[in-house]
Amino acid sequence: MTCLFALSLGYLWSVANPLLFAMIYYFIFKLVMRVQIPNYTVFLITGLFPWQWFASSATNSLFSFIANAQIIKKTVFPRSVIPLSNVMMEGLHFLCTIPVIVVFLFVYGMTPSLSWVWGIPLIAIGQVIFTFGVSIIFSTLNLFFRDLERFVSLGIMLMFYCTPILYASDMIPEKFSWIITYNPLASMILSWRDLFMNGTLNYEYISILYFTGIILTVVGLSIFNKLKYRFAEIL
């Protein structure tokens, strides 16, 4: 009974946390600033929910090795699974929000597409690779540069507003279009939004997500493999 209650609370938190932010942003941008985007609630949550997965994983990764210091010191195991498990857990929270997206689709007279069956796993795997690459870099470097968390928090907030989550990508002036072009997080969000709202797979965005994700993972694992032998003494 206790386990069931804990699972229920976990599910409620997975849904309530991003939904609360969605309500706040809806009030500010739709009701106050009157942003003219059709089906804005669906538009908002299809960008905000996957963003929450990335942002929570990246932020939590900063302390993933520090929080597991005793296990790292006393047990021999692939330590890279620690940030990976965090990414997977946040991904599970994201999957819990998909029923909420379905409900809002029906509210706005839209329906899920059959392409979700293969589209969700395809984009989700790309996001796992991308987010793991970022997480392994942050979790490793934060052991040696403890002030990194301040810069990461600032960077994530900056990237949130540079990514078309609250606004449509076509609202950006031509001279600032590079913000989307060179922002892999924009490709990630737009991939999800195209799938959920239009039932389409934008393979250009998905390819960018995979390409940058693989590069980040290779770089991250290289940094990790160079520094992992010093973990015990640092911790």
What are the functions of these language-model segments?
Residues M1-L235:
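Hydrophobic transmembrane alpha-helices and immediately adjacent juxtamembrane helices
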